[in-house]
């Protein structure tokens, strides 16, 4: 009888512990679902709030990084080519596409020369990204590149049934050299980042060079993509910081910041099935934690409801929200949706500038002069919910100021979407197209 009582007592205690754990779990989830995790009244600056919120999302900032902005195609390719020419060990490239033009051919010549020296050169390109540009790499080009020592492969080849390959495209742009220098941002490999195009004029975009411990994160991202495509696991071959001798790279652009080698950075990587919410949660927290000013440039501002609400909520709590979009665009219908959204956001109190001289394909956000991001992510449903994307989040006032200065300069080449301007600027037919396009925004 006593044993039965003891067993009953133990059972009751176990049930009590389990119930307590369940209550704590539910309370924790309810707290996390409430939006910004730290009350604004806490007095913490927005960059501290962002770091706390992202940590709860599983994103951790590393210290000791150095970021250099590359604000033009010429800057990007000059810097990238100079670094690759000095590679000693490995060059890994992951792009949405390599356009079959002069800048790509120059890149491949440099890579082939490094391969001849014994440097391991691996490259990935997205099948849809390649086929959707007007100068794709053909099979004969891929064969020739492999014969020259460049180990290049296609991410997710498009095969029947084609509908299975619409989503989950690799839109990232990553280069890692010797495991010590990385490049990421919004630019693929194409002449038009330097020359522009007849259709849109100058093609503006943003890239950056990264040095420091966060390079390892980009290297790991490449390794996972490489294994997915080729089946080869190369993640243990000593391609990380500290696993190879420390090399010097000369002739690269200086970042002009007095915080060099002391920057806090986090890689925000969206992968279906692994981290599907990463980028949209970053943007949500970046906007929701703002206390003073948000400056945002994005080419395809078709938005999802969560980000749209975050922007209008920011205005309601007194944050100045400034958004820049481009008047020219490289695709149909999407810009109609963008301009429709801009009109709606302007009515809610956002300040909108429309950039006229060319296509501003830049994807950046700057908040409170304290933090920013540079990356591949468009603020559309495809980037935020479907594709592989990567952004570098940077907690640094110097880099944020450089991007803010660019924003202010570009205002001079933009017109302000004041009250009534939308109806003067867009014809009734264009406004109807915008309304219709916004209905399709989950698919744009």
Name the predicted role of every residue range.
Residues 16-26:
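Bacterial N-terminal signal peptides
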């Amino acid at each position: 009888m006593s044993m039965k009582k003891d067993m009953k007592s133990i059972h009751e205690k176990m049930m009590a512990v389990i119930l307590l754990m369940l209550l704590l779990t539910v309370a924790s989830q309810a707290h996390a679902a409430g939006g910004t995790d730290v009350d604004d009244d806490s007095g913490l600056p927005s960059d501290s709030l962002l770091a706390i919120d992202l940590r709860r999302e599983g994103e951790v900032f590393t210290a000791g990084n150095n970021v250099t902005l590359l604000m033009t195609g010429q800057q990007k390719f000059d810097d990238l080519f100079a670094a690759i020419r000095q590679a000693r060990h490995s060059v890994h490239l992951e792009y949405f596409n390599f356009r079959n033009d002069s800048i790509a051919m120059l890149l491949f010549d440099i890579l082939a020369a490094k391969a001849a020296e014994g440097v391991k050169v691996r490259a990935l390109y997205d099948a849809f990204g390649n086929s959707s540009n007007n100068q794709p790499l053909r099979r004969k080009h891929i064969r020739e590149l492999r014969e020259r020592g460049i180990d290049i492969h296609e991410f997710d080849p498009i095969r029947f049934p084609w509908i299975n390959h619409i989503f989950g495209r690799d839109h990232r742009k990553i280069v890692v050299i010797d495991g010590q220098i990385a490049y990421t941002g919004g630019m693929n490999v194409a002449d038009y980042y330097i020359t522009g195009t007849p259709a849109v004029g100058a093609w503006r975009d943003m890239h950056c060079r990264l040095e420091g411990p966060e390079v390892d994160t980009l290297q790991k991202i490449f390794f996972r993509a490489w294994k997915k495509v080729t089946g080869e696991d190369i993640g243990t071959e000593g391609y990380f910081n500290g696993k190879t001798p420390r090399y010097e790279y000369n002739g690269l652009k200086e970042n002009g910041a007095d915080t060099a080698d002391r920057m806090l950075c986090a890689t925000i990587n969206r992968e279906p099935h692994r981290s599907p919410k990463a980028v949209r949660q970053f943007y949500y927290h970046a906007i929701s934690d703002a206390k003073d000013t948000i400056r945002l440039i994005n080419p395809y501002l078709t938005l999802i409801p969560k980000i749209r609400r975050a922007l209008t909520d920011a205005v309601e709590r007194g944050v100045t929200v400034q958004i820049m979009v481009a008047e020219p665009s490289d695709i149909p219908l999407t810009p109609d949706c963008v301009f429709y959204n801009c009109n709606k956001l302007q009515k809610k109190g956002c300040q909108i500038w429309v950039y006229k001289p060319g296509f501003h394909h830049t994807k950046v956000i700057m908040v409170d002069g304290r933090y920013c991001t540079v990356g591949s992510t468009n603020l559309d449903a495809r980037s935020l919910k479907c594709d592989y994307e990567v952004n570098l989040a940077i907690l640094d006032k110097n880099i944020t100021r450089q991007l803010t200065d660019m924003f202010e300069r570009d205002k001079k080449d933009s017109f302000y979407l004041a009250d009534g301007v939308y109806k003067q600027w867009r014809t009734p037919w264009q406004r109807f197209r915008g309304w219709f396009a916004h209905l399709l925004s989950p698919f744009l």
